[in-house]
């Protein structure tokens, strides 16, 4: 199944192995340098199938920057354990997150690099649980409220009630906002 990826070209890095969470968090510290432009999408992926790999290879054949990357992170441990309503974290059933990162240097080229990441994310829709990692969603003006709701999954309505109780004036709104009322 991984042969198409390996035949596409040599990876800059290959971390196909179990690793501690802290190591995962530090993997890209050096590569994500100061002055670079970024656009990130992170759909939750149910399974890495041959069709999913083919989709990835097809879109990387059209990549707009050699700095761009895509990484599958396997979800395990606390991210998948426990009832869905225990935390705000949605889509516990998804097995992977696909971190799609378009990275480039010249701010004037932003539109085409962002478009590439969005197109890859959209092409991956058939393989997802219907949501994305909330920290990698844009704001409502960019994403639309439906995508933000999908990011929180089944927890959204409960989070709206909590927001209405603890932040009824929507003071904390500069994020992937949950308004205090629907």
Mark where each language-model region is.
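Soluble FAD-dependent oxygen oxidases
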Residues: 1-182
């Amino acid at each position: 199944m991984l042969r198409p990826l390996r035949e596409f070209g040599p990876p800059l890095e290959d971390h196909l192995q179990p690793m501690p969470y802290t190591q995962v968090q530090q993997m890209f510290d050096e590569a994500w340098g100061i002055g670079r432009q970024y656009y990130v999408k992170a759909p939750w992926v149910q399974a890495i199938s041959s069709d999913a790999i083919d989709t990835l290879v097809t879109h990387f054949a059209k990549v707009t920057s050699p700095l761009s990357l895509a990484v599958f992170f396997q979800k395990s441990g606390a991210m998948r354990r426990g009832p869905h309503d225990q935390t705000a974290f949605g889509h516990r059933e998804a097995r992977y997150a696909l971190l799609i990162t378009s990275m480039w240097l010249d701010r004037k080229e932003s539109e085409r690099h962002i478009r590439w990441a969005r197109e890859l994310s959209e092409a991956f829709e058939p393989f997802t649980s219907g949501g994305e990692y909330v920290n990698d969603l844009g704001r409502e003006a960019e994403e639309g409220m439906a995508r933000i709701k999908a990011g929180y999954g089944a927890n959204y309505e409960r989070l709206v009630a909590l927001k209405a109780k603890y932040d009824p004036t929507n003071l904390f709104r500069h994020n992937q906002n949950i308004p205090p009322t629907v």
